[in-house]
Amino acid sequence: MAVYSAVAWILLFGVLASLGAQNPVSWEVQRFDGWYNNLMEHRWGSKGSRLQRLVPASYADGVYQPLREPYLPNPRHLSNRVMRGPAGQPSLRNRTVLGVFFGYHVLSDLVSVETPGCPAEFLNIYIPRGDPVFDPDKRGNVVLPFQRSRWDRSTGQSPSNPRDLTNQVTGWLDGSAIYGSSHSWSDTLRSFSGGQLASGPDPAFPRNSQNSLLMWMAPDPATGQGGPQGLYAFGAQRGNREPFLQALGLLWFRYHNLCAKRLAQEHPHWGDEELFQHARKRVIATYQNIAMYEWLPSFLKQTPPEYPGYHPFLDPSISPEFVVASEQFLSTMVPPGVYMRNASCHFQGIANRNSSVSGALRVCNSYWSRENPKLQRAEDVDALLLGMASQIAEREDHLVVEDVQDFWPGPLKFSRTDYLASCLQRGRDLGLPSYTKAREALGLPPVSHWQDINPALSRSNGTVLEATAALYNQDLSRLELLAGGLLESHGDPGPLFSAIVLDQFVRLRDGDRYWFENNRNGLFSKEEIAEIRNTSLRDILVAVTNVDPSALQPSVFFWLAGDPCPQPSQLSTQGLPACAPLFVRDYFKGSGFGFGLTIGTLCCFPLVSLLSAWIVARLRMRNFKRLQRQDRQSIMCEKLVGGVEALEWQGRKEPCRPVLVHLQPGQIRVVDGRLTVLRTIQLRPPQQVNLILSSNRGRRTLLLKIPKEYDLVLLFNMEEERQALVENIRAALKENGLSFQEWELREQELMRAAVTRQQRGHLLETFFRHLFSQVLDINQADAGTLPLDSSTKVREALTCELSRAEFADSLGLKPQDMFVESMFSLADKDGNGYLSFREFLDILVVFMKGSPEEKSRLMFRMYDFDGNGLISKDEFIRMLRSFIEISNNCLSKDQLAEVVESMFRESGFQDKEELTWEDFHFMLRDHDSDLRFTQLCVKGVEVPEVIKNLCRRASYISQEKICPSPRMSAHCARNNTKTASSPQRLQCPVDTDPPQEIRRRFGKKVTSFQPLLFTEAHREKFQRSRRHQTVQQFKRFIENYRRHIGCVAVFYTITGALFLERAYYYAFAAHHSGITDTTRVGIILSRGTAASISFMFSYILLTMCRNLITFLRETFLNRYIPFDAAVDFHRFIASTAIILTVLHSAGHVVNVYLFSISPLSVLSCLFPDLFHDDGSEFPQKYYWWFFQTVPGLTGVLLLLALAIMYVFASHHFRRRSFRGFWLTHHLYIFLYILLIIHGSFALIQMPRFHIFFLVPAIIYVGDKLVSLSRKKVEISVVKAELLPSGVTHLRFQRPQGFEYKSGQWVRIACLALGTTEYHPFTLTSAPHEDTLSLHIRAAGPWTTRLREIYSPPTGDTCARYPKLYLDGPFGEGHQEWHKFEVSVLVGAGIGVTPFASILKDLVFKSSVSCQVFCKKIYFIWVTRTQRQFEWLADIIREVEENDSRDLVSVHIYITQLAEKFDLRTTMLYICERHFQKVLNRSLFTGLRSVTHFGRPPFEPFFNSLQEVHPQVRKIGVFSCGPPGMTKNVEKACQLINKQDRTHFSHHYENF
């Protein structure tokens, strides 16, 4: 029951609603857009429909290319020769000017083809050289632009379907010039009150044009003024072109409102819509009647046939022939000026812009004029209408006044153009047929001679036809329809134009079912039709202007004799103001500086970012240094009393440095700001010291010249400071008994006389060269020549003596070292504190050519301090201490005593307290070969090759120079005996036993052999040709990096393909958009790079999916994709992307410039959603493109974000301010938001960024969520320990389910230092351990503060330690060590941390009998001193204790020792080997590992590995440390891989 009630109520409300919604009109309302005026073809005559040809098209290619010169004449030339003539010739039929402009109003109601087509195509008019209007300077390069009109996109495809233009208004006489061509346009014009059209402040005028009403707003060609002000809202888009058209538009506007007002009075119950539609219906009918039955007969001098009724099968479409015929005939009647009069026949004077007064409005200065002071009131408009009704038009012939011919409103940059030339180009654009073909098609008699076109013209002015014939090469078939039609005209349109126009109007009438005479459409009754037929334009004028009917003639389209208010005279150019001349608009005027400044600002983004990064880095370094200063005592308290501040001048090209000069007993010390001793000058008699003072420039320079030293030049702030130091030096010299001289020189001469350190260095270099040339028998030419420019320099070089500091520097040692003291004292025979050439030569001969006995005797004398011929145990301990000074190792006194006792006991001298030389030499008997190859190493001096060969040691890092195994010694001896007499080098066959030091690590007994000369062992012939080595190196490179190369090739192939696809598209396939015609290079570059950038910035996210990479490393994909190189690939992609971004920006800079100088008609084609061509022409300025568009503003912000991110991500700033890098790199979120917005505006093409971005973004977000789920869990620190060398050891809880592998790394954040700043560190714990551990070196502010925070707490609990956030683990290349049968681990500095975990993991797996593919690991630890990372020594010691299977071979390199094999290093080597032989431990580290002094020579080491492991075809090399070290390892691997033997696969990580 309830359901029935609901249905009843619904039906009741529906009936009530239908009763209340009555239709306000009782007839079928005519649409505004022209649809359904013909029911046969609904689209006929609608807005946007195409023109319908009367004659087939005539295009050059039969499709769309217009006919051009030279087939057709130049349009400007044709206009000048045929259509130019004087003004002031009245119409032969006395037609009025009102009829002329009413005809233009009718045409604006019927057709509009002026709208430029898209893409923009130009059919420019080339101006003949010296044209008086357009080329008065005779440049010969003037081109008037002509843009082709809009066409139907479905046409222009083939000769059977040639291009057809479209009509931008309705093709009916339906009042579209009054009400608009669309419903929305009409709504904009309406007031929606009383059925009237909206008016402005004055009811007689419509409101001004608004943005919602897209009126044509061309700039005033006379003044250049533009904008919508002063333009009225009409139905015709170009209704404001002249005041005369405006007056007619105002006439019909006022007439509609008058009709609506009368209807409202007659029918007060009607609403707005009913009133508006009734008034519109009546106005359109009146307009049709006047146009068809009053104006058309006056125009053609023919009466149209009687109305036969509506014919639905008749096509009423506008023809292109009609467009040209009607417009051109009207243009011949346009006068140079227009009168204005009142109802009493008073013709008004017109005040011009130059304050002059003329009798009429000048037409050429009235185009698109705004706010004309003579047309501000309704009376002014009435006066203009009355004046046009009384003024006789120009003669109907082929001539056109200059106001139309030369000063028509110009398109684009030109303020003026030739109207007739433009019309000729329009006809060619329309593809109009020739004059003869048109006559033939319309059934007119053919014309076979030029004189037959217009016999009257031929008789009166035959030269015109002759000139026309000459322009068309006497070929009548080429004569264009427009030119031929004009030549036919004489008082009336010629037969051709008349036939075209009449045919068009008849078809419009008969094919329109809304025609007012059609009594079947229900619009009007017969009485109303009769009333409309009796209404003329004179009636409209009288009704609107309220003038007396006697003030107007009966037919306002003619002025006949006897009609009221005759014109004063036929207007000519005489007495009228001159036309404003042509000017060319510069769209970029005033923008050059701002545009350049904008580009400069964009280019400064990286510089500003660089400056910001530098400031941040400086602040961070300042804070870091302040933290470091807090950890050590201030050095200011160590300043010596009496120090004098000065600047030391070091040479003309060297900067001055601030120093402190201290006078101490017997010496002068020069120190820097940190009190580091720069130089010590000994004051010993009988030296002669010279003090030279400057005598000019403030007398503030001092030169201290001491014999056998380089000079000290000091600059002071003032003379008083210099004088105080000089007095102190005088006193010190007198106190030490030194004589001195003092004089003054000009400062320039003083500095010229000074011997700088650099000059002294050149002298010492010559000294050493000639010294070694005598000792080592080096060729004199190889040693260099003494300076020969002056005898003084030669004498100085020969008499040069070395100071103690120079002697120490030449050995690469410190002057205060005990070794230097002992050596120098021994060599300085005369005790003068300097070594002469002969003294140095004597001791050098012993080291270079002496026997082992002579060398040991020299060593014995050096350390026999009391000179009694015996060395006591205390002296032996002092000697040993001097040996180990270089390593900065401070062994305890007990340890040194233990070493000495062991050496005495080993040699059988345990009962002796003192040793003779014989005893000392006997103690060194096992190291005879070491002493034999000992030399005194001098910095900068190359040792001859033979000495180098002798000095190569028996070690695992070099090729054996002695027979390496007992079973080979006899064979070596036999071969050597056989070849002893041969000049060839002795050879030794290849040894297959491990080298000596490696065998020692396996516990094999080593037998000592005498050194024998032989060539290096070769498994096969070594190809030495550079070409073969290059090929081999290339093969190894491909083998090492085949996965990298493959991935890079695939990635960049896709990137290049995307670039090429977009570049090809916009270069060759995007002509339909027209953008390549505007900016070819810019658009190709910007769109091609945009595609590549979109791909790169999307897929770069995958390189940062750490969890995904760690997982995929364990899959089969790792065989094809080098996941360990993800970070390097990330940097590689980023570097390429920023380069493409710069190119993309450069392309858009070109685009912006070209868009800023492109007219609006072109821009509206390129960006139809952004611009509408309203005739204003002026494009947007450059700043609009940069800062007021979404792509522009986001692009600028993107450049800023990228500049910040890239600068702070550089290696330099990342090391100095990791926090700055961390924070700025989080701009990537902002970056991707901007990228999405930037590409989503669809300015040039539809958005494509999401195609590349979605998949990587989803994967990346998922990976981040995985990290986020675990990295926000607080982890407690179990133990924190501060280790030497600024290393902090953290041991913290292992989260549940945390699985990792040795060599992996994690990211941690300390809650006390911020919860968002994560830093990566390698795990040093082994996977089997219950806790996790990190060793973190204090290398920056964050790690330094971390070290402070984890200082030892006062209690025993770990609760006071700040907690951590942990993210990881993540994989690295070092994780693959177990995949190689033999692996080499090379760690330097803090780069040893990943190997600590690997070593512990390997030993653990071997101890539990776990199957491991890796059979041998060589661990090379490179450190400045063994004390640098003592925590690693503890780990190595643990490994040695647990390594029962000898899986790990550890070698430690101490690089702070002298790098070359000098005497002291030899002795240190002897002591180290002796200590290791006795206690099986290193003297320095306390480990069983082999300790070496210097840097590891990787290439010989890798060579020896091939001998030790001949069956292993691939060895893994893993290095971690500074870039210099990893580069050396990489270089060694590349060199070894040139040989076609064992392959070394290198994986490295820098820190």
Swiss-Prot record:
GO CC list: apical plasma membrane; cell leading edge; cell surface; endoplasmic reticulum; NADPH oxidase complex; plasma membrane
Activity regulation as described: The NADPH oxidase activity is calcium-dependent. Peroxidase activity is inhibited by aminobenzohydrazide.
Membrane topology term: Multi-pass membrane protein
Pathway where this protein functions: Hormone biosynthesis; thyroid hormone biosynthesis
PTM entry text: N-glycosylated.
Keyword terms of this UniProt record: Calcium, Cell membrane, FAD, Flavoprotein, Glycoprotein, Hydrogen peroxide, Membrane, Metal-binding, NADP, Oxidoreductase, Peroxidase, Repeat, Signal, Thyroid hormones biosynthesis, Transmembrane, Transmembrane helix
Signal peptide span: 1-21
InterPro entries (alphabetical): DUOX_peroxidase, EF-hand-dom_pair, EF_Hand_1_Ca_BS, EF_hand_dom, FAD-bd_8, FAD-bd_FR_type, Fe3_Rdtase_TM_dom, Fe_red_NAD-bd_6
Binding site for Ca(2+) 1: 828, 830, 832, 834, 839
UniProt GO molecular function: calcium ion binding; heme binding; NADH oxidase H202-forming activity; NADPH oxidase H202-forming activity; peroxidase activity; superoxide-generating NAD(P)H oxidase activity
Biological process according to GO: cuticle development; cytokine-mediated signaling pathway; defense response; hormone biosynthetic process; hydrogen peroxide biosynthetic process; hydrogen peroxide catabolic process; positive regulation of cell motility; positive regulation of wound healing
Pfam families: An_peroxidase, EF-hand_1, EF-hand_7, FAD_binding_8, Ferric_reduct, NAD_binding_6
Subunit structure: Interacts with TXNDC11, TPO and CYBA.
Name of the protein this chain belongs to: Dual oxidase 1
Organism this protein belongs to: Rattus norvegicus (Rat)
